[in-house]
A protein has these predicted regions:
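N-terminal leader/linker segments that initiate helical-solenoid repeat arrays
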Residues: 20-82, 93, 98
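Helix-turn-helix repeat elements of alpha-solenoid scaffolds
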Residues: 33-47, 74-86, 116-126, 156-165, ...
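Structural motif corresponding to the intra-repeat A-B loop/turn of tetratricopeptide repeats
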Residues: 73-74, 107, 114, 154, ...
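Amphipathic alpha-helical segments of tetratricopeptide repeats
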Residues: 46-51, 85-92, 125-132, 165-175, ...
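Bacterial N-terminal signal peptides
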Residues: 9-16
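TPR/Sel1-like alpha-solenoid repeat signature
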Residues: 63, 100-111, 123, 140-151, ...
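Hydrophobic positions within repeat-based interaction scaffolds
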Residues: 24-42, 50, 78-81, 280-283, ...
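Residue signature of alpha-solenoid helical repeat architecture, marking inter-repeat boundaries
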Residues: 57-60, 98, 138, 178, ...
């Protein structure tokens, strides 16, 4: 009976070990599949039963992969960050910098989806810390690109520009033109908002040329729209209208003429037509942009566009009404975005980075001083030795045959 129990125990143990190895191998296979076929990866992950009963390492990898595949899916939505927290809690206590960086990056994406800017920025900064000098150019690019977008949404153009420029070398090293074309409009916008229009124009033209060459249609819509904004800032309204029409032509082909995504572009065209004194057409497009009170940013822009059209046509009462509405909405928008919290977090991170940099510089200075001391001591010893040799030779009589002295 005792032998039977031992046999059964060994069989169960072997089965469990095999199952553990099988699950680990399966998760590693899914990890390789995510980039190529995220839908298939999601289906395979859902086939894993009782993930909460997996080992700590497998459960962390499962949580990371599930979050990652949901982030890549347009159909799935996050409800909370509890899943990715499992991965972070595990990997932050290990030396696995690859998975730790991925965990924090995906946590940043979840927070971004949930409109929690501070949590998003915190996780992106932790991603950069874990990446260090890693040669993972794609993730190095993506985290800085997402941070640039975050500051774009929060109306902080100097940080949008700084992070966009920091992301560009990594995008270029990946060799993926889509990454470059996605990033360049944010660099352009950062230069525009900091009144560096010549630099903005340079990057905008670069984006247009690359996107047209690679036929990146969806990217071209954003690039054309951004270039039209730039032309407006440079008061080249005819050029701006041309790029507005190019942008809308792409959007009509992709979504049709009546789509909530296009309404914002109608506002942009109305603004351009107002500057060209084509007021009837401006009213036509501003009225095509339907009212959407749930999107404060959209309603703010529409109110300003209406105010400018009414003012240009001498309808000052209506212009005054929409200008006041625009001012109220913009104040509310800035208040809700809580720029100060975001800036404080980023400023603290910069201070920590400066402290680290100063420590490295101090260590380098100490090393240089030590090297200088060593060189000085060696030189002094060499001079002293040379002096001793010279003194010894000076004591020898001039007619003394040194060879005889040595041979003796």
């Amino acid at each position: 009976m005792k032998h039977l129990r031992q046999t059964v125990l060994f069989i169960l143990l072997g089965f469990l070990l095999t199952a553990c190895h099988h699950t680990a191998d399966r998760l590693l296979s899914i990890e390789q599949l995510i980039k190529l076929k995220p839908d298939s990866a999601l289906s395979l992950l859902r086939q894993i039963q009782y993930p909460e009963k997996l080992s700590d390492s497998n459960r962390a990898l499962y949580a990371l992969l599930m979050t990652q595949v949901i982030n890549q899916s347009s159909d799935e939505e996050h409800k909370s960050d509890s899943l990715i927290s499992v991965a972070i809690d595990y990997y932050k206590g290990t030396t696995d910098s690859v998975h730790a960086a991925l965990a924090y990056y995906n946590a940043g994406l979840v927070a971004m989806d949930n409109e929690d800017s501070e949590a998003s920025l915190h996780n992106f900064l932790k991603t950069i810390d874990w990446l260090g000098e890693s040669d993972n150019d794609e993730l190095q690019f993506m985290v800085r690109y997402k941070m640039s977008r975050l500051f774009n949404l929060r109306l902080i153009p100097d940080e949008e520009l700084r992070l966009g420029k920091a992301a560009l070398p990594y995008a270029e090293r990946t060799g993926n033109p889509l990454y470059i074309c996605a990033l360049l409009p944010y660099i352009t916008h950062g230069f525009m908002q900091t009144n560096q229009l010549d630099s903005a124009y340079k990057y905008s033209v670069q984006a247009i040329q690359l996107a047209e060459k690679e036929n990146l249609v969806r990217a071209l819509s954003h690039i054309y729209s951004q270039h039209a904004h730039l032309c407006m800032a440079m008061k080249d309204y005819k050029q701006a209208l041309m790029y507005r029409d190019k942008d809308l032509a792409i959007l009509f082909e992709l979504f049709g003429e009546e789509n909530e995504y296009i309404y914002d572009h109608y506002i942009n065209k109305a603004n351009t037509l107002t500057e060209l004194h084509q007021y009837d057409s401006a009213f036509y497009y501003i009225n095509k942009a339907v009212e959407d009170t749930t999107d404060i940013q959209y309603t703010t822009r529409k109110s300003l566009a209406k105010a400018e059209i009414y003012a240009a046509t001498g309808q000052m009462d209506s212009a005054y009404y929409y200008m006041n509405r625009h001012a109220d909405l913009r104040d509310r928008l800035i208040e809700e975005r809580d720029k100060e919290g975001l800036l404080t977090l980023h400023r603290n991170y910069h201070n920590d980075e400066l402290k680290k940099a100063n420590t490295r510089l101090w260590q380098q200075a100490v090393e240089r001083k030590l090297q200088l001391y060593v060189v000085t001591i060696v030189c002094c010893l060499a001079i002293l030795l040379g002096g001793c040799i010279y003194f010894f030779l000076s004591l020898i009589p001039q007619h003394f045959d040194l060879t005889l002295f040595i041979s003796s």
